Amino acid sequence: MKIAVYGKGGIGKSTTSCNISIALARRGKKVLQIGCDPKHDSTFTLTGFLIPTIIDTLQLKDYHYEDVWPEDVIYKGYGGVDCVEAGGPPAGAGCGGYVVGETVKLLKELNAFYEYDIILFDVLGDVVCGGFAAPLNYADYCIIITDNGFDALFAANRIAASVREKARTHPLRLAGLVGNRTSKRDLIDKYVEACPMPVLEVLPLIEDIRVSRVKGKTLFEMVESQPSLNYVCDFYLNIADQILSQPEGIVPKEVPDRELFSLLSDFYLNPVDKTKDKKENKKEDKENSADFTWL
């Protein structure tokens, strides 16, 4: 099974991807995580350092694929998850999609691409040009990481459009949304109402999730010294279980940009006053109770 993880830049895709990868490994699966970002930091919390990229290695070997060995590009991460960083072209030059293609090509040459139960592509930001949509060509499922904010959901909608486009020619489905580090989910629910799709999980606003990135550790590794964080790992295990159940998934129908802009803007401009609603409900209950006469 191949999974592509997308979402707005800075939303926590890599942190989420690494924890999902370990959760899948904990379920007995052989997992490979491929970072598809020129920053090559996708697997940082799995390995604890920035591993050399495929492009770095190919350049050292003068692009002689026959001189590259699996151990040159595949690094063992925490929890038995194997890690690869595709890397990228120099800033302002080349195409990231080409790099993803070269990565897959090399892994196939090494007979490594088909050795895994799960391959997870962690893809750069919310860029959905043809190049960075390339991992969708190989994926069975796409997962979108979001939060309860306007920008993240707007990006999610554009990614949903990319999934729909790729699904025309590939057996690709959207597995669903994952809400990351958010104290509320009302805007997520509003979006899902307009663009129906599964919500796999919504992780609460837990500071340790952010801290784990800085420490270069996954939540699963942090639990070894902080058992109180065990409940956080359950969120990722729940996502893993849903993925392993091989959900039917959907081909999403994105909301038109202007319509979505209006929908999300209206939610901010005209928030529901829940306090007022509660007062009105109490008043209603009081009035209703007055209608009864005990005999």
UniProtKB/Swiss-Prot annotation:
Its cofactor is [4Fe-4S] cluster. Binds 1 [4Fe-4S] cluster per dimer. It is found in: Plastid, Chloroplast. Residues 275-295 are annotated as: Disordered. CDD domains: Bchl-like. It is an enzyme of class 1 (oxidoreductase). It comes from the Eukaryota. Pathway: Porphyrin-containing compound metabolism; chlorophyll biosynthesis (light-independent). GO terms for molecular function: 4 iron, 4 sulfur cluster binding; ATP binding; metal ion binding; oxidoreductase activity, acting on iron-sulfur proteins as donors; oxidoreductase activity, acting on the CH-CH group of donors, iron-sulfur protein as acceptor. Mg(2+) binds at S14. Component of the dark-operative protochlorophyllide reductase (DPOR) that uses Mg-ATP and reduced ferredoxin to reduce ring D of protochlorophyllide (Pchlide) to form chlorophyllide a (Chlide). This reaction is light-independent. The L component serves as a unique electron donor to the NB-component of the complex, and binds Mg-ATP. This is Light-independent protochlorophyllide reductase iron-sulfur ATP-binding protein. It comes from Physcomitrium patens.
